[in-house]
Amino acid sequence: MTNSVSRLVDGGFFQTPVFLALTLGVPFGIFKLLFGILALRSALENHVTYLVWFGYIAVVWASVDIIMSILTAIFGLAGHRSPIDYCTLAEMGSFLGRPGVYQAIDTLISFSIICFVLWSGWILNLNFIEARLWYAATTVNLISVALVALCAELRKEEERRCEANIDPL
C-alpha cells in the first residue's frame, strides 16, 4: 500500500468528523431539505394543510442538521472535538446515552426519504438548482461509501500480505 493511502486508512481519515460531516451529514441534510421543499410544493399545489406543516418541519429540521454538520466539520478542521453531534437525532441520542443508535435512525430516515422522492416521482418536481443539489449530495455520499469500502479492502489485503510475509507489488 502506498504511504499516502496507508496514512488515509491507518490514520482513520474516513472516520474523522470532517469526512463524516461533509460526506454523510451535509448530504443527508440536503436530502431532507429538498424533501421538505417538495412536500411544501405538493401541499400548495394540492391544498393539503397537514403537508404544509410537515414540509416546514422538514425544512427546519434539515437546516439545523446541515448547520450542525458544517459546525462539526469546522471544529474538526480546527483540530477540536465538536461540542455537538452531526445531526439533531444524534444529539438527542447523546442525551439518552445512545448517539450511534439515533444517528443510525437518522440514516434510515434519510435513505427512506431518498427512496420516497425517487419512487413517488417527486424528484421530477425539483428545479434546476435543486436537482443539482440532489445530484451533488448523491455523488458525494455514494463516492465516499465507495472510497471507504476500497480502503477497507486495501487494508485487508495489506494485513494478509503482512501475515503471509508477501512483498507488495
Mark where each language-model region is.
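Juxtamembrane inter-helical linkers in multi-pass membrane proteins
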Residues: L77-L96
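Alpha-helical transmembrane segments and their membrane-interface junctions
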Residues: V26-F35, A104-R132
